[in-house]
Amino acid sequence: MIKTFTIILAIFCLLPYAGKAQEVEKSQMLDKGQLSQAFELQKENDSLYWLVATGGDKVNGWRLAYPVYQFQTGDVNGDGSQDMMVGVIKKTRFYPMGKRLFIFKQIDGTNKKGEVCKKVRPMWLGSKLGGILEDFRFLAPAEGDSMGRIRALESTTDSLYVVSDYKWSGFGMKFDHHIIKGVDKETATKYLNQ
């Protein structure tokens, strides 16, 4: 049963984006010489989105069958290419708090017809950062650093809030440092947005 579900899920997720979504939530464009990277988060309904890599004649999407609460772009891993950070609401068996951070990249590939196209592929489908994720934002690399950071607003089990920075560690996000901890949500939100 699990193997069948995994195979069906993998096949379904790899299908090229075939339909038009009802609305485009947000998009970001980056010009890199002759390569143009564009990303769109397209909403079909409250719990079905498509993360679409455009920038060419052919496009390919990644199906997100979860409500989305946040969408950001930036160079997470320092490779010079834009990545996509998507906040989804998805509970897991061992971690029922619903908000997650998924990170995607854009690659060149071919579709079933052998045509060159832009594809969306996951870099990290995280179940947890540190605390209970409430929100996040991408911070561009600091001077002298090649990697950006993800600043996360997290709640704690004692109803307080923490704002922390995370950096890419080769596979996934690694805690870097706290900005502030043990504060109310309003104070933490101010630090998240600094």
Protein language model features and the residues they cover:
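Beta-propeller-forming repeat regions
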Residues: G19-Q194
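Sec-dependent N-terminal signal peptides
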Residues: T4-L15
